Swiss-Prot record:
Involved in the gluconeogenesis. Catalyzes stereospecifically the conversion of dihydroxyacetone phosphate (DHAP) to D-glyceraldehyde-3-phosphate (G3P). It comes from Aster yellows witches'-broom phytoplasma (strain AYWB). CDD domains: TIM. This is Triosephosphate isomerase. Substrate binds at residues 13-15, 176, 216. Homodimer. It catalyses: D-glyceraldehyde 3-phosphate = dihydroxyacetone phosphate. One of its GO terms (biological process) is glycolytic process.
Amino acid sequence: MNYKPRTKVIAGNWKMHKCKDEALEFIQKVSLQVPDQTQVQTLIFPQLTLLDPLVQLQGANLQVGAQNMFYETEGAFTGEVSPQNLLSLGVKHVLLGHSERRTLFGETDQTVNLKLLSALKHKLVPTVCVGESLLTKENNQTQMFLDQQLTNIFAGVPEEALKNMIIAYEPVWAIGTGKSANPQDANKTIEQIREKVTALYSFQASCAIRIIYGGSLSVANIKSILEQPAIDGILAGKASLQTEDFLFFAQIASKQVLVSTKDIFQKNDCPFCY
């Protein structure tokens, strides 16, 4: 299996924000100023209706992805979008399993797994969300919960696919609440997620997959988050809506040292691949 170095990821989930004119203006401005893709990968996940016009403006430095997709290719599934439809628009990335999809629309680990398998089958690049509730955190069951969530979601996923995927750790209690995880705590949890990937697959596979953090990000805490050695980037919600803030996130990320997989394999004393 061949692996590429892990670059930082700066992703924005716009949720149900921005109309066409606002979105076009954002993409036009940001695409001219974001760092080179070899330094940091920048992604925007807009509403479904914005995909077509925004994909026309995406380039090497800024790409557009879908917030969701269904696992079937066609059929009587009112309100859903198929992976084939996304591909026909030129979409290459898709966000799967966001906690709002779970709490508001009844998605489960099993449906996320089906979507993940379908996305991989159709050569889409999935960003898969995982995260625990406040009750789980307060009961000190975060690691056990995430281990089971990862086991369920990754069932049937081949090891070879991991190098083209992203895991987004988004603690449910931190999404849209203004309560971001302590950077060191987020780093520790992402270390544990990588350990679980090692257990499910291999050390090499866990070194290949990128794991990012999301949850109440801001210009005030972005630097301390991205400085954490185990965190490969961010998935921002509200904080990604302002052009200046998104560019600031990308600029901070570009200053971080790229992680070379080759170097990782030479560091036998480093169990978490950073």
